Amino acid sequence: YADGQTAGRPALKAPVTQEAAFTRTGERNRVTGKETFTAWTPATKELAQEATPVVTGFVADKANVAAKTVTPDDKDSEETVKYSKLGSYVPNVPDGLPKVPNLPYPNDPTDPTKPGTDLPVIPHVPGTTPVGPDGTTPLTPKDPSDPSKGYNPPPIPSDPTQDTPI
């Protein structure tokens, strides 16, 4: 996780290790001490692309670790995928009225780098009309003839790790 915290969060996929094996033979001239080697076999090796899994409630910084061609002269390398917590719609209900819990943004089921489009319904609190993050624009009811069915949320911000006040 990008913030280093793991307690109370979904378990992440175990690290994936890909190895490339190269071989060659060598000889040492017993008179001169000179060593000679054959060419490496294979000369290059392709490491496979690794898809980043979706982790509920989080977005990843990359959709996959790209395939990579390595040679015997390459140093060991490591790729890290960082997950950041998705933001939420944060209802600000006036004192004395029933509180509404934060509504986390959904995950995209196929792209770990984006929030989903299956947005939650903002619950209706009698006596109030929820407004968007600008603090003045009312949210539109799911059913204009029956606001008790809740409201359509505003769009998720371009940085999906940021909360949206309602």
Predicted regions and their residues:
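Extracellular modular ligand-binding repeats in secreted and cell-surface proteins
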Residues: 1-166
